[in-house]
Amino acid sequence: MKRVLNLGNLSRIVEGDPNEITDDEILVIKDKIIEGKIIDIQKRVDGKLVSLITEKYTYTINPTPADAIVVINGSTTKSIRAAKGHTVTWSVSKTGFVTQSGSDVISGDVSKDVTLVANPAS
């Protein structure tokens, strides 16, 4: 559910579910701990939400085997966009292989190769 915070001539400023944001709206993301603090403002460009105030970087995991399951910050995905200083937690798993996991702090674009090894118990 989204809530309109302000109605302008060219766009609406809203907060809520990012999936509901249209091309003519600006999404305001508030801090969940500090009341009233805005941590990001985003707008949809070419179908994707991009930050207007914080620089974002791409964090990608390239798993071997290629069909391994990659989970980044709790979501099954091989790539995310995150702000500098953000901690990313990840895991790569596949039946018959030893799961690998870890965390990294974003400081720029990352393309991380993760190779799983066969589980000797399988």
UniProtKB/Swiss-Prot annotation:
Superkingdom is Viruses
Swiss-Prot/TrEMBL GO biological process terms: symbiont entry into host cell; virion attachment to host cell
* Principal location listed in the UniProt entry: virion
Q: Per the database entry, which stretches of residues form a coiled coil?
A: none
Location relative to the cell: Virion
Which key words tag this protein in UniProt? Answer: Host-virus interaction, Viral attachment to host cell, Virion, Virus entry into host cell
List the GO cellular component terms. virion component
Assembly state and interactors? Homodimer. Interacts with the major capsid protein.
Please explain the role this protein plays, according to its UniProt record. Answer: Forms short fibers at the surface of the viral capsid.
Q: What is this protein called?
A: Head fiber dimeric protein
| Organism expressing this protein natively | Bacteroides phage crAss001 (Bacteroides phage PhiCrAss001)
Upper taxonomic lineage: Viruses, Duplodnaviria, Heunggongvirae, Uroviricota, Caudoviricetes
